[in-house]
Design a protein with these regions (language model features):
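N-terminal low-complexity regulatory segments of large eukaryotic nuclear proteins
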Residues: 1-15, 22
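Acidic, glycine-rich two-metal-ion catalytic cores of nucleic acid-processing enzymes
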Residues: 17-32, 37-52, 56, 63, ...
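Extended non-globular interaction regions in eukaryotic gene-expression and organellar proteins
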Residues: 68, 75-78
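Charged, often flexible domain-edge or linker segments that flank or initiate folded functional domains
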Residues: 73, 87-89
Length: 225
């Protein structure tokens, strides 16, 4: 059974399946099997992820002609909703996305994405490294769901340094989590999405602004050279 997730945060449980929106994991249909990408509340379920079949390729290059107009339409609406939320200063990190947009849009968006997901599964061979990709995707999804505690006062004080000003402003306005791009570089190294915490390019001066969730941090540097 094809289905789509409605949010990628662990606490925002929601899927679209059997032509209905479901917000309780206990009510997930038994036959859900194929979706676009991983969300933390899918851990433990035997699910296949179509996005991993592309191995970083642009999904637009694999959308059949008869679905391109529909996909473009729902994406324009998605961008409009995100822009409105940004202008209204509504945090998508602190709120579940499905609580911020009309249910009619969620249904329309998921219907189109289900069709694209099905097309990917039926036209592209499963990658030989799929199981590895899946484990990495799950790990990155779980990392993404962990909010980073930031000493905002310290970061603000570092804005006085011209060399640190831009990154300080980025840290103060970004989503307080790390969203990695699994296929972000040709070399296979990870990169991060824009508007999320810049963990890979963080200036050393900002390290003490990251507060531990428990007692302390342990920094481990793996050098592949």
């Amino acid at each position: 059974m094809y289905f789509q997730t409605l949010d990628d945060k662990a606490e925002c449980v929601g899927i679209y399946a059997n032509e209905r929106l479901i917000f309780d994991a206990d009510n997930f249909p038994a036959g859900i099997k194929n979706t676009w990408s991983y969300s933390p509340y899918l851990r433990g379920l035997d699910v296949e992820y179509a996005s991993l079949y592309l191995e970083g390729q642009d999904v637009w290059d694999h959308i059949p002609e008869y679905l391109k107009d529909d996909w473009e339409d729902v994406n324009k609406r998605l961008v409009s909703f995100r822009r409105s939320l940004a202008l209204s200063k509504v945090s998508r990190t602190e709120n579940c996305f499905f609580d911020l947009v009309p249910e009619r849009f969620l249904v329309d968006y998921c219907e189109v994405k289900n069709k694209i997901t099905k097309h990917i599964f039926t036209t592209i061979n499963k990658p030989k490294r799929y199981d590895f990709y899946k484990h990495i995707s799950m790990m990155l999804g779980d990392i993404q769901s962990r909010e980073i505690s930031i000493d905002r006062r310290l970061v603000t004080s570092l804005k006085k340094n011209p060399k640190l000003k831009n990154q300080a402003e980025n840290i103060l306005t970004c989503d307080p989590c790390v969203r990695y791009k699994q296929f972000g570089t040709k070399t296979g190294r990870l990169s991060t999405h824009k508007n999320t915490f810049p963990i890979l390019t963080l200036n050393r001066s900002f390290r003490r602004a990251i507060l531990p969730t428990n007692d302390f941090f342990v920094e481990i540097d793996f050098n592949g050279a």
